[in-house]
Each structure stands twice: as structure tokens, then as C-alpha cells.
Curated annotation (Swiss-Prot):
PROSITE patterns: CHORISMATE_SYNTHASE_1, CHORISMATE_SYNTHASE_3. Homotetramer. The lineage of its organism: Bacteria, Pseudomonadati, Pseudomonadota, Alphaproteobacteria, Hyphomicrobiales. It comes from Rhizobium leguminosarum bv. trifolii (strain WSM2304). One of its GO terms (biological process) is aromatic amino acid family biosynthetic process. One of its GO terms (cellular component) is cytosol. NADP(+) binds at R48, R54. CDD domains: Chorismate_synthase. This is Chorismate synthase. Its cofactor is FMNH2. Keywords: Amino-acid biosynthesis, Aromatic amino acid biosynthesis, FAD, Flavoprotein, FMN, Lyase, NADP. Reduced FMN (FMNH(2)).
Length: 365
């Protein structure tokens, strides 16, 4: 299986499976001289790890990251400095239950990658989905922690803005609320609504989709290039690579189809300090594939996980019709833990474009 690497200068290769002994990543192209502590990475993995509320999978993983290479340890025994060589990171799997998947060893779960993996490769890891499992994204979040160190002054934050048909009130957006509830919601009022709604979903053994929004602030103007190296193109590509993602939009996205040219174009004026001021940000901080200096705004939709208790029709590897019921521990709404994953992907895209821009223009933004 190829294509386990993304990025141009800031390159990330992930490895490992859901029920293997461990998974991890190698980050190549990270500049030397960046200083950090393990806790600077662990905070993002703790945000993604399973088992933190009744609304996510009850698989218990500590997701403790180990940095194996690419750094030198300071005298304090905690601070690490990147050397510019590949940074290898490892996360152990400790709570696999492969026996839960014995019945589907030869059955294709509807809506999963089982059929297409088997069709393409002639073999698949049925234990939790192998590489197609969202367990792989723990390694991406670790890589995203490194990416956040690359571009000075950039803050990447995400929030859950919709579960099923229940949307947040955007007028109530408060970043301080995001870390205060199990949904990463910026709207405190929607939390009890989501709790009641998801409790019903869980009780029925079903699942539901969601929308995640990621905003990157402090992004330097000038990142990205026209035509085939657009910043929004690469952000969309990385977000689409996340498990269960079925749609991505930048800025106003699909809502722009209902907007007039007068309302959609972001008008500009010159500020008193000689720096242009945008009067709106419908473009999501990117014009012509190049960052404007405004916040970069992206949203992505995740489908309901196909791992549900309802019996469904499918086929098996012998071409026979079968009825499949998925066992195991699964997220009733994968959008919750997709928040830190989306943050990591956007951070990696921005870090890569920052290094590419520096190499092409020589500018240190």
C-alpha cells in the first residue's frame, strides 16, 4: 500500500494499524532549532484520545507519544531541540479487542473500506479496519504538534459547529467554551441539546454526522501559489484525507452559490498604518490560492460512522449475501474527535507552505 506520506517540504509519513502493537509517524523537513517539551505534543493527543466521555468510543488508550529521533535533549531533561533530521514518534496501542471483529473477517461492512481494500489489494486487516481506522489519526495529531512550532505567531483552533441538524448559534461563539464541554462547542447553549440528542443516538446503537470548523489566525500573507499549489487546495486535500470526511469548504464555501458578487467579494481599504484592511472574510483568508493575512477558515463534514448495531445487508468474500451487525466500541459521532485531527491537518498544510514560500521567495514572514 503506497501513499502514506503527505507534504512537500514538511513531509509526514504515518505508519501502523488500529490493532497492531503501535502506530506513529516520521516528520521530515522540520527546521532545526525549534524547542519544545513533550507536553507541547501530548496536549493535542489528549484532546483526540478515546474514552473521555460517553459520547465517544470507550476504547481506552493513553496515547502517550514518544519522540525517538530528530531532537537533542537539553540539560533539564525535558526540553528538546529539533536537529533538522527526521523526527520519529511512536504511540503504543494498549486496548485492542480483535475478538470483536472475528465475525466480519470475511464479511464486508456496508459503508466501510472493507470491500474496496479487499478489491484493490486482495487482503485487508479486518481487526478494527487496520489502516482505514481513525486510530491512524493519532499519528497525524502528533505531527500537527510539530507543525505548530514551525510558523511563528500562528494559532490553529477548531470547534464542532453542527451535529445532525442541530447547529450552534454563531452569534454566541466563544473560544473559551470549547475546552469546557465534551463536544468542543463554542456555544454553551447547544451543549445540553447535543447531549440529549446523542444519548438517544447511542441508545439506539446508531450514529450521526457532524461539521467541524477550523480557523487559523496569524497566517502570514503570501502563502500558497497559483494554479496547482494553492493553499486552500492543499488544506482541502488534507482535510478530505481524514476518515469519514465527505465534504470540505473554505470561507463561505457552498453558501457563496447563493450570494451576489456585491455581497461576496471582500472589500478593502488602506489602514492608517499602511496595511490593507479587509471589510469581510468571505474568502476564508485565501484569494487565488494565496493567503491574504486574514484568518484562514475551513469547514468539513463527516458522515455518520458505519459501525452501528443495526443489522444491514451486505456480501462476503465468497460472493454470498449476508446480514452484518458491527460489534466493537465505536464513536456515535466521529465529528467530536475529528476536531483536533482537523486542526493538525491545517497546521501541517500551513507549515509546509510556509517553508515552501521561504524557499522560493527568501522571505522570513
Amino acid at each position: 500500500m503506497s501513499h502514506n506520506t503527505f507534504g512537500h517540504l514538511f513531509r509526514v509519513t504515518t505508519w501502523g494499524e488500529s490493532h497492531g502493537p503501535a502506530l506513529g509517524c516520521v516528520v521530515d523537513g522540520c527546521p532545526p532549532g525549534l524547542r519544545f517539551k513533550l507536553e507541547d505534543l501530548q496536549v493535542w493527543l489528549d484532546k483526540r484520545k478515546p474514552g473521555q466521555s460517553r459520547f465517544v468510543t470507550q476504547r481506552r488508550e493513553d496515547d502517550l507519544v514518544k519522540v525517538l529521533s530528530g531532537v537533542m535533549l537539553d540539560a533539564d531533561g525535558e526540553t528538546m531541540t529539533t536537529t533538522g533530521t527526521p523526527i520519529s514518534m511512536l504511540i503504543e496501542n494498549t486496548d485492542q479487542r480483535s475478538k470483536d471483529y472475528g465475525e466480519i473477517a470475511r464479511q464486508f461492512r456496508p459503508g466501510h473500506a472493507d470491500y474496496t481494500y479487499d478489491l484493490k489489494y486482495g487482503i485487508r486487516d479486518y481487526r478494527g479496519g487496520g489502516r482505514s481506522s481513525a486510530r491512524e489519526t493519532a499519528a497525524r495529531v502528533a505531527a500537527g504538534g510539530i507543525a505548530r512550532l514551525v510558523v511563528p505567531g500562528v494559532t490553529v483552533r477548531g470547534a464542532l459547529v453542527q451535529i445532525g441538524k442541530h447547529k450552534i448559534d454563531r452569534r454566541a461563539w466563544d473560544w473559551d467554551q470549547v475546552g469546557q464541554n465534551p463536544f468542543f462547542s463554542p456555544d454553551a447553549a447547544i451543549v445540553p441539546v447535543w447531549e440529549e440528542y446523542l444519548d438517544g443516538i447511542r441508545k439506539n446503537g446508531s450514529s450521526i454526522g457532524a461539521v467541524v470548523e477550523v480557523i487559523a489566525e496569524g497566517v502570514p500573507a503570501g502563502l500558497g501559489a497559483p494554479i496547482y499549489s494553492k493553499l486552500d487546495q492543499d488544506i482541502a486535500s488534507l482535510l478530505m484525507s481524514i476518515n469519514a470526511v465527505k465534504g470540505v469548504e473554505i470561507g463561505n464555501g457552498f453558501a457563496a452559490a447563493e450570494t451576489s458578487g456585491e455581497d461576496n467579494a471582500d472589500e478593502m481599504r488602506m489602514g492608517n498604518d499602511g496595511v490593507p484592511i479587509f471589510l469581510s472574510n468571505n474568502a476564508g483568508g485565501i484569494l487565488g490560492g494565496i493567503s491574504t493575512g486574514q484568518p484562514v477558515v475551513a469547514r468539513f463534514a463527516v458522515k455518520p460512522t458505519s459501525s452501528i448495531l443495526t443489522e444491514r445487508q451486505s456480501i462476503d468474500a465468497d460472493g454470498k449475501n449476508v446480514d452484518v451487525r458491527t460489534k466493537g466500541r465505536h464513536d456515535p459521532c466521529v465529528g467530536i474527535r475529528a476536531v483536533p485531527i482537523g486542526e493538525a491537518m491545517v497546521a501541517c498544510a500551513i507549515a509546509d507552505h510556509y517553508l515552501r514560500d521561504r524557499g522560493q521567495t527568501g522571505r522570513l514572514k
